[in-house]
Amino acid sequence: MRRVVSILLILSFGFVFVFPQTKQKPVSQFENVEPFSIGKGSSFSASVPRSNSDSSQTQAIPNGNISQDFSDALEFIRKNHVDGKNVNYNELTKSAIDSMLHTLDPHSNYFDADEYQDLLTDEQSEYYGIGATIANYQKGNETNTFIVATFPDSPAFRAGLRYGDKILAVNGETMADKNSSFVRDKVRGKKGSVVRLLVERAATKRQDTVDLKRNRVPQPTIPDAYIIREGIGYIDMSEGFNYTTAEELTVALSELHKQGMTSLILDLRENPGGILDQAVKVAEKFLPSGSTILSQRGRFSIDNRVWRSTNKTAETMPLAVLVNGSTASASEIVSGALQDYDRALVIGENTFGKGLVQSIIDLPYGSGLTLTTAKYYTPSGRSIQRDYSKSGLYDYFNHKVSLSEQNKTEAKTLTGRKVFGGDGITPDEIVTNSPLTNTQAKLLDPIFFFSSELANGNIQGFESYKIGGQIQYGKRIRPSDYPVTDEILKAFNNFLVQNGDWKSLSSNIEAENAFIKTRIRYNLITAAFGTVSANQVLIEEDKQMAKAVEV
């Protein structure tokens, strides 16, 4: 079965800005559209079902014997390769299909049955697990997986798992030196089933066996929304677009209006895309009825579509949109349309640049295929897809290749400003947040372990920083919440010196003073109030956010 998706955007002026359109009849996003995803990498959009028996469009596949060649080669490998008895032939076949698809473009992909199920689970905005954020940290030669945070009222929270607890085993299988994604997959399972964890408590170093019943774990796409300065609202939309995004945005806007919001910062950084129908509804919040949001053009006429807003009460307040290199696909549609209509000031770094639409094909035995079947364009006619013809997958996904200015396609916004296509969305205000230096990256491990000791009252002289009682999820933090003083910085330096593997890092304390203080406080706030509140700490040091507040 094949499926496809669509998109729309809205404007905050008293008239409609109509760009040249393709001649096909516009399609409302509310008419029989089965939403799926458009996203970065292995996310995509869905498509209207189309018959596979359209013989008028079908051509004979050249080299008809190639499939027999492949079968013969596989059999020859099985019989003759030195490791033939140990080869995973499913993986071998999967890699062959992937290579074939990636010859076409970077976003056509094959998913085996497990991967396909994970994909569908992610799109439903929920999974069955224990409700905890986990991460890998290294001390000495050992890498282990630790609890970083738990979700409100989740199985992990009710079982008393807390910041810094180490996961030693899952259902009797050791997790030492395992990647956190491997541990996550072991912890997840069928709803209502029981998973047994062996954990080492951060506070006491005691080992406990904990049985947790897996349950539905909601994954909101708007983890936070609050007044960042008087009159200025902030909405974090970093988690993509799923089936609940538009409803979440409606609730967030309503609450912020009640708190006196007169302007808004919409944060699309790190947003990988998602369900197109939801991205359309997000854009419609800010663009008026009749505004073209997106056009889609494909090989077949059925893939040619146009989406327009139907919102007659669009928001009219000043709007800033934050983007970066991980703002991809459906989130680029939102930011691109708002920019084309001069409805929002786009701030940050060039976006990812994914303008291809994938259709999903259900294959036998539970696997799935995504195939690029169309390209999408912003209201001004821009394609934001980056060139992939001269680069490999690594260079493409790591932004090693970009278009020169003279090769970008020029378009104009509603007020006549020049904008360019072919390399993502270029912000109106380019502001770059500095990436972690090598030294800062090396400091993350000891900062985590020190923070865990501090939060559990194990750092002498700083017992008052011990975090006890229930986690106060979603608290608006104040400067008085877990301030990191120079005395704590000295204690951290002693911690480095006493742990031989990190001793050499102590020479960087003075140069990295601000970074270390921010990260320790971030960890303490995470332990006390959860990750949503902790993100407020990082925002205080955010250059892009500062620019958005300024303008």
Predicted features, each with a name:
Residues 1-4:
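Positively charged n-region of N-terminal signal peptides that target proteins for export
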Residues 8-16:
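Bacterial N-terminal signal peptides
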Residues 22-58:
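Cationic-aromatic interfacial patches
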Residues 47-58, 72-81, 231, 528-532:
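Acidic/histidine-rich, surface-exposed loop or edge segments in extracytoplasmic proteins
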Residues 61-66, 77-89, 146-162, 168-364, ...:
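Cleft-lining beta-strand/loop regions that shape enzyme active-site pockets
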Residues 78-145, 194-224, 538-549:
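Extended, small/polar residue-biased N-terminal targeting/export presequences
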Residues 330, 342, 349, 353-412:
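Polar, glycine-rich mid-to-C-terminal structural blocks
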Residues 383-384, 388-551:
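Conserved functional hotspot residues or short segments at active or partner-binding sites
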